[in-house]
Amino acid sequence: MEIFQVGGSIRDELLGIKPNDKDWVVVGSTPEEMEANGFKAIGKDFPVFLHPKTKEAYALARTEKKSGVGYKGFTFYFDPSITLEEDLQRRDLTINAMAKDNKGKIIDPFNGKKDLEQEILKHTSPAFLEDPLRAIRLARFKTYGHLHNFKIAKETQNMLNKIASTDELSTLSAERIWMEVHKALNRENSDNFFKILVEFNLTDPWFTNLKKVSSDGSEPRYKWAEIQRVNNFKLAKNLPVPNEFKKTTEIIKKTLDFIAATSLQD
């Protein structure tokens, strides 16, 4: 059994940012061995375990194969023979496909560190195209304060355009889309999320009426209300928007309608 720290926490550490949490991959182990060592199984689709003390997530190394539509249309394979590099290859971006061993050595088979230094967002493999959620996640990464100036690699732009040309985005659940939107709204550069959707025609079917982007607002619900306002309050009718967001948007809409009506009377 070998344990490696992986993913976004490595990226953030290399940028001098303390990660909020850490993810771990276990190579050469089995579910039975993990549970025998006190780990608690929590994964439904693939083996993920909680550390008995830190409660951090530890996943067995795995590969995945497209077997259906949408981000859930994958079959996962895991056994002790799967290597760390095989596990890293399934990750979305090169800057998220790095690992660190217990001696602090960085394992970087896809040159994520170089892309990090050059401020480039680049997909790890052609498998990026198989999961439409990766396009939405990439848009969200552009809202991060330490990533918002990163450029999207030309070849990755081509991937986004290909995803936009299919109907794969429609296979995503409304709940999953809103989760990404909500995460983006909680970031300082949330307008970048919507800019990417517009730039790469990723607006259908969830943001069909999205034409303009605004960065006004501090709290997520006010940001959402402002996005709605500049798009004539016609945006994302099929998303499970929380009531507090809806109420804030409705108050602003009624206020603007009242002002407009009063102006006409004058």
Spans of features found by a protein language model:
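Catalytic cores of the polymerase beta-like nucleotidyltransferase superfamily
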Residues: 1-266
